[in-house]
Design a protein with these regions (language model features):
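Glycine-rich, N-terminal phosphate-binding loop of Rossmann-like dinucleotide-binding domains
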Residues: 126-127, 207
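Predominantly a Rossmann-like dinucleotide-binding segment in NAD(P)-dependent oxidoreductases
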Residues: 179-329, 452
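Short amphipathic alpha-helix with an adjacent loop that forms part of the alpha/beta core around
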Residues: 109-119
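C-terminal capping/lid region of NAD(P)-dependent oxidoreductase domains
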Residues: 16-19, 23-26, 30, 171, ...
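Beta-strand-loop-alpha-helix segment that lines the small-molecule cofactor/substrate pocket
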Residues: 122, 128-129, 133-180, 195
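Conserved SAM-binding strand-loop segment of SAM-dependent methyltransferases
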Residues: 102-108
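N-terminal Rossmann-like dinucleotide-binding module
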Residues: 3-100
């Protein structure tokens, strides 16, 4: 869709919404009624590429798999031509899905770069948090463009090092701040920038992790110890410091943060509980974090077990996983240290203040955001929002149902592929140059939390 068609379509949909006596269609519904492409959020600079961008996937876990899927969906834009992944099942799955020859399949990221000059256009780095900096620096040195998972790096020094290397090499480094690419946040940003609520005065933003998700990733899972990964404000919430910086439209000046681990610890282990849920735990039937319930009976979050395609074989394999991996351990008897609740206050250089809460103990997911402006306010939950104007008291609503990441994952990959294919970084909303700032807010917040200080943020 061209920019002109895009603007005309939106105007038409808005009229349609208004006519309906303020019973508003979602964009998605309206697009369906009008028989239009549902994806109204395509970047106006997108164009057909001369050839697909050739990428090497480094880290073929959960995120890497999602990004690689884009090549299956859009083979004219992206091809996965190599993979580096120590886990054999994951490596073979990607190789089979993308027809990668054995000589382009590796067990470690370093092997990708041993052959000397680049044999692809770009690399996607979706390795664990502590394994981003080294492959990114090496890729830039050899002349690859990069799509880098967030957090870009565990420390401020490494983050600045990546920025310097990207600038020196002139290569494109996109950071996976997927929220920026969601229709929901794009619409919010457009309304704010269009002055629909006057000047932004303050923001309240909450990230509800959801209690089982918390237990899976930050109590039992890879991200449970900040030393081994990154502090949770980076691992989970650098998306939020990023979205706040983006919506407010000014750099952060100061940050203050409180937060601690209050519930998921030994002192709260119920009487009768056992080291593993499969050890005959007496409270297992009523425990909200029962691994038997989550993984075995409800069959949720099973990607961590690398199960075969044939679901009839899963039962015994899941039970074996619960007896041998961290995912079967009692949530009160882990070696976790990530805070399960945290609040940060941010003062931006334009005087806007933002309050951010990261909460584990909630039954829902989906960021909640309230934006207070001089001429109106916005209240939203990532599926819908309502804008109320102080001028005429009118309320305007927007809604769209999408996947867990608000539909941002593949929209982000598309923008990055287009940026690489067209050699135009302007197509990317989250290049490293911008992303460093959001990371600096998170590093400062963690410093404040640990040292009980108010931290200055300096670019
Ligand atoms: N953008 C987002 O919204 C988002 C969401 C979740 C996670 N993440 C981030 O994405 C990254 C990956 O997370 P994930 O959930 O996919 O984790 P994961 O554990 O599923 O995947 C990481 C993969 O890297 C592989 N790996 C480890 N060492 C390697 C090496 N030396 N060479 C090559 N591969 C190696 C692992 O075997 C694993 O398969 C993390 O940094 C995480 O914080 C981002």
């Amino acid at each position: 869709m061209s920019l002109r068609q895009f603007i005309a379509t939106r105007a038409l949909l808005k009229t349609l919404s208004a006519i309906k006596n303020s019973i508003l269609y979602s964009w998605e519904e309206a697009a369906r009624i009008l028989g239009l492409d549902e994806d109204l959020y395509t970047h106006p600079l997108h164009r057909e590429l001369d050839r697909p961008v050739r990428v090497i996937l480094i880290g073929a876990g959960n995120r890497g798999g999602i990004y690689a899927d884009y090549a299956t969906k859009s083979p004219r834009e992206m091809r996965v031509v190599g993979v580096a992944e120590p886990n054999g099942a994951r490596r073979r799955r990607i190789a089979a899905a993308h027809g990668i020859p054995p000589e382009r399949c590796f067990t470690d990221w370093k092997q990708v770069f041993e052959g000397g000059p680049p044999w692809a256009d770009a690399v996607i780095i979706a390795t664990p948090d502590r394994l981003h900096t080294a492959p990114c620096l090496r890729a830039l040195e050899l002349g690859y463009d990069v799509l880098l998972e967030k957090p870009a790096a565990p420390t401020e020094a490494e983050c600045r090092q990546i920025l310097a290397a990207a600038q020196a090499s002139g290569r494109i480094v996109g950071v996976c701040h997927v929220l920026r690419y969601t229709p929901y946040f794009r619409e919010l940003k457009a309304l704010i920038d269009g002055g629909m609520i006057g000047q932004v005065i303050s923001v309240q933003h909450m990230e509800p992790i959801e209690h089982v998700h918390m237990s899976h990733s930050y109590v039992r899972g890879h991200w449970r110890k900040s030393e081994d990964t990154t502090p949770i404000i980076l691992a989970k919430s650098c998306h939020d410091t990023d979205i706040l910086r983006w919506l407010v439209g000014a750099p952060a000046a100061e940050v203050h943060c409180y937060g601690n681990l209050k519930w998921f610890k030994q002192a709260n282990a119920p009487e009768g509980s056992t080291p593993r849920c499969t050890d005959g735990c007496k409270v297992e039937p009523e425990c909200p974090y029962s691994a038997l319930q989550i993984y075995y009976r409800d069959r949720k979050r099973l990607y961590v077990f690398d199960l075969p395609a044939d679901a009839s074989k899963w039962g015994p394999l899941i039970l074996q996983g619960l007896q041998t991996t961290d995912y079967g351990r009692c949530v009160y008897r882990m070696d976790n240290d990530q805070p399960d609740h945290l609040t940060a206050n941010i003062l931006f250089s334009n005087g806007v203040t933002a309050g951010f809460s990261m909460e584990a103990f909630v039954s829902y997911e989906g960021r909640r955001t309230r934006i207070m402006g001089s001429m109106g306010d916005i209240v939203g939950d990532m599926e819908s929002f309502t804008l109320t104007s102080f001028k005429d008291g009118k309320r305007r609503s927007w809604s769209m149902k999408t996947d867990a990441h608000g539909g941002g994952d593949h929209r982000m990959v598309k923008d990055w592929v287009q940026a690489v294919g067209q050699r135009n970084p302007a197509l990317l909303s989250s290049p490293i140059e911008v992303s460093v700032e959001s990371h600096l807010i998170a590093y400062a917040a963690e410093k404040s939390r640990v040292n009980r200080t108010i931290e200055t943020v300096q670019m």
